[in-house]
């Protein structure tokens, strides 16, 4: 199995994972930031999707990857497609859970506020996520996963510290769940341009089959 691993900046990702059905690794990349003129990599990201997703993206058949990467309507269709989605995020540079939580919270809150959807329910759901993350310390190789079922507007976040300690949180606010998807899969506004570019190239290839 090891030989089949896809290496994302020296972090191995399985080409397929099984949840309720097999999901394929269709996009991967990193989050990074320039600090004191050095490019620091924080996380490696793998995006796993049900291969049926291409049925919902047929109107983009024939488009090249670089065209799709710039097309936010394409990524909106990907996010709203009623298929299972799974994000596997591996920590490269250790970070406090509270720092990761603040990044997630501010991005999701800003996106909700921009669409006039930030109400008390959304605030409460975000607070629960921040509380869940803030007591943790994400060492290198900590695994964070987001599982988005095909038909339910929920998400399950799982954090595995040092390969053993699993904690789970279910997010049940649909608006917050949608904006978490947009944080990672939101086209030109996504947190990881390399992941968006990889998704666009691979989905372009899948659509041309």
Curated annotation (Swiss-Prot):
A Pfam family assignment: Chalcone
Protein's recorded name: Chalcone isomerase-like protein 2
Source species, domain of life: Eukaryota
Organism field: Humulus lupulus (European hop)
Gene name per UniProt: CHIL2
Pathway: Secondary metabolite biosynthesis; flavonoid biosynthesis
Subunit note: Component an active demethylxanthohumol (DMX) biosynthetic metabolon in glandular trichomes (lupulin glands) that encompasses a chalcone synthase (CHS) and a membrane-bound prenyltransferase. Interacts with CHS_H1 and PT1L.
Reactions catalysed: a chalcone = a flavanone
SUPFAM superfamilies named in the record: Chalcone isomerase
PANTHER family assigned to the protein according to its UniProt record, in alphabetical order: CHALCONE--FLAVANONE ISOMERASE 3-RELATED (PTHR47588:SF1), CHALCONE--FLAVONONE ISOMERASE 3-RELATED (PTHR47588)
One example GO MF annotation: chalcone isomerase activity
Entry function: Involved in the biosynthesis of prenylated phenolics natural products which contribute to the bitter taste of beer and display broad biological activities. Involved in anthocyanin biosynthesis. Polyketide binding proteins (PBP) which promotes the catalytic activities of CHS_H1 and PT1L and triggers demethylxanthohumol (DMX) production.
Keywords linked to the UniProt accession: Cytoplasm, Flavonoid biosynthesis, Isomerase
Enzymatic class: isomerase
One cellular component (GO) term of this entry: cytoplasm
Recorded family membership: Belongs to the chalcone isomerase family.
């Amino acid at each position: 199995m090891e030989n089949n691993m896809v290496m994302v900046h020296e972090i191995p990702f399985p080409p397929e994972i099984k949840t309720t059905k097999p999901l394929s690794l269709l996009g991967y990349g990193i989050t990074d930031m320039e600090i004191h003129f050095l490019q620091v990599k924080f996380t490696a990201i793998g995006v796993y999707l049900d291969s049926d997703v291409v049925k919902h993206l047929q109107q983009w058949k024939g488009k090249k990857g670089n065209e799709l990467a710039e097309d936010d309507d394409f990524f909106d269709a990907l996010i709203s497609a009623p298929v299972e989605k799974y994000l596997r995020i591996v920590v490269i540079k250790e970070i406090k859970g509270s720092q990761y939580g603040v990044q997630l919270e501010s991005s999701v809150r800003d996106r909700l506020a921009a669409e006039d959807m930030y109400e008390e329910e959304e605030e409460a759901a975000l607070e629960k996520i921040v509380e869940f993350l803030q007591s943790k310390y994400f060492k290198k190789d900590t695994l964070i996963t987001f599982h988005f079922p095909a038909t339910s507007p929920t998400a399950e976040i799982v954090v595995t510290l040092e390969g053993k300690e699993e904690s789970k949180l279910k997010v049940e606010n649909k608006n917050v769940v949608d904006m978490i998807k947009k944080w990672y899969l939101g086209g030109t506004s996504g947190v990881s341009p390399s992941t968006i570019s990889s998704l666009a190239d691979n989905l372009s290839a899948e659509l041309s089959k």
